[in-house]
Structure formats: C-alpha cells, structure tokens
C-alpha cells in the first residue's frame, strides 16, 4: 500500500507533507460526519497526509484531513513501477517525496490510452482522482494525469497544500462546526421523506424502455446519482439499494461488483457502502 519515499530523508521534501495532519480524524457514525465539511473540489494533499489519515481512521471510517472529508484529491510526484499488463487499466506508484501511494487509471477510451502513453517511469506528473479504501489498502482511482513540464509546478503544489491547510485550521473548523451541525440537525428529521420522494422517478423509470424495464446497471447508477444519495458522505449501503430497487441482494452483489470493476462506482467507509464516480 504505502512505502517510504525513494527521496533522501534530508531532501527538500523531508518533514512529510509540510504540515502534520494532527487534526485529521475519523468519522465513526452518521452523527460525527455532520461535524465534518465535505469539500467538493480538488483537495491538494501529500501522500504523508493520506497515510496519516488512513492510519488514524483505519477501516471503520472515511478519510478526513483537518475537518475536510476527502472526495477528490490532487497530487504531484514521480511515477514508478508502471504496469500495463491489463488492457483496461494501467497501474503505477506515485512517489511525492513524503511517501508512496498505489494508483490505477482506467483506459476504456482512446483518450485515456493516449493520455497514459506520455506517462512513464521517472516522469513527474500532476494527477487527480478518488481515494479508495478496501480491505486495509488505500489507492488512488485516477481520472486525470499529465506530465509536469515546469518543475515550478511541483513547488506550487506544496504551497497549495500549505495554503489549504492554513485556511482550514483548527480554529476555523471550530467556528463553522456549530453552524454545520445545526444545519444538518435541522434537516435530519426530513431525510427519510426526501429519500422516498426522490426515489419515485427511479422506480417509475423502469418502464421507459421497450422491454418494460431498464437494465440493472442503469437502475443502480440512477439511484446513486440522486441528490439525496450523493449528499450522503458515507455512501449508500447495498442493503438499502436492494430494498429500494426491489432487487434480490444475491443478484445485486454481482452487478455492484461489476460496476465497481468498471470504475463507475466505488466503495466508501467499507465494502458495503457505495457512491457513483463523478466525472
């Protein structure tokens, strides 16, 4: 999963991520997730921040750095151990000087394959992707990667990390914590109603095609794309999907596994909660 960086300990990147992720914390229940902010944009981070975040949260919770729930992140670093043995994916390791993280890039389209041609071992790249934790391993599901032509971009990325960390310091997180918690508490009582209301279009759309039913893949994706589902940071439990879409769980599990393998959905806090990939 993670390993020590190939850079020397006394290099310019030593110290690991510039800022320690002491405020990083896990959310272990839906009540505590309300205290964390979900940042929808790309969060500039270092591998060490991700490593410390994963070590503190373990497998019981999501990944949170300084009160920010990590969804999409951006990193810069050196490409190592590129593996193109599979037709549909390319795997490689990113070393940013603070640590290493495994990465995977799907190459289902011509554009994806062309993008990865310029990414070779020893190349500095900037990449963006989703953090995914499954069975004790964390990897980055990459949706964008490009070589760095100007090394100033590496320096700028670390300045971004420092700036973002400073903006979301402990004092600022406490100031907005009460407001965020009160807003979530206000709408908590109506969550079930909203979920039921938004479910109707999905269920009724089963009869939109010529055969009278949509295929299971589309039904599951449509359900996970609903605002009520995307707003839930912990993802949707597979039992809920089975119940709401009236699909036998044993049949649903195979479809979900296929969608995850195709990179259309990803697991969140454990192997039973899922969210769709926002492209």
Swiss-Prot record:
Membrane-spanning ranges: none
InterPro entries per the UniProt record, alphabetical: NA-bd_OB-fold, NA-bd_OB_tRNA, RFA2-like, Rfa2/RPA32, RPA_C, WH-like_DNA-bd_sf, WH_DNA-bd_sf
Organism: Arabidopsis thaliana (Mouse-ear cress)
Gene name per UniProt: RPA2A
Domain of life: Eukaryota
Consequences of knocking out this gene: Affected cell division in meristems but normal final cell sizes. Earlier flowering and smaller plant size. Enhanced sensitivity to methyl methanesulfonate (MMS), a genotoxic agent that damages DNA bases. Enhanced expression of some transposons. When associated with ROS1 disruption, restored silencing of some genes associated with increased histone H3 acetylation and histone H3 'Lys-4' methylation (H3K4me2), but decreased histone H3 'Lys-9' methylation (H3K9me2) in their promoter.
Record-annotated DNA-binding residue ranges: 73-148
Nucleotide-binding keyword on record: no
Task performed by this protein: Component of the replication protein A complex (RPA) required for DNA recombination, repair and replication. The activity of RPA is mediated by single-stranded DNA binding and protein interactions. Required fo cell division in meristems. Involved in the maintenance of transcriptional epigenetic gene silencing (TGS) at specific loci (including some transposons) by regulating histone H3 acetylation, 'Lys-4' and 'Lys-9' methylation.
Subcellular location per the Swiss-Prot or TrEMBL entry: Nucleus
Family in the record: Belongs to the replication factor A protein 2 family.
Chain positions covered by the region annotation Disordered: 1-33
Record's comment on post-translational modification: Phosphorylated in a cell-cycle-dependent manner (from the S phase until mitosis). In response to DNA damage, recruited to DNA-repair nuclear foci, as a hypophosphorylated form.
Tissues where this protein is expressed: Strongly expressed in shoot and root meristems. Present in seedlings, roots, leaves, siliques and flowers.
Pfam families in alphabetical order: RPA_C (PF08784), tRNA_anti-codon (PF01336)
GO terms of molecular function: DNA binding
Name by which UniProt lists this protein: Replication protein A 32 kDa subunit A
